Amino acid sequence: MLAAFDKVVITPPLDGTWPDAFIDLKTGVLDDIHARLLLIDAQGQGGALLVSLDVLNVGLPEMQRLESALCHVTGLPSEAVWIMVSHSHSAPIVGAIDDYTGLGPWWSAVCDRIISSVQTLGRRLQPV
């Protein structure tokens, strides 16, 4: 079995765009939030991609778009791509919340970073 791991910073800018911040954003960031990625290649027995996001929640349309892009990049079927969230109340909610979509540009950048990371994971697979 082969595997590769990456951790990508996804901390959003502190520019007041959060619709319902649970924290005082003016004090800065104590700890960045991340996307953690694990690519597994079972060498002929299939594979899987696990993505963990430090966010409160991800809306279904946003989740489906990310999953589709990851399936396209990896060649894995959707049942082999698992995306989960930490449900941190100190992190953004992704999706249309009360018709608020101000985090859209940040989420697009997060997806781009995740996809870029996954593209490099395939070249970094190591025996485990």
Language-model segment annotations:
Residues 1-84, 88-128:
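Conserved beta-alpha junction segments in alpha/beta enzyme cores
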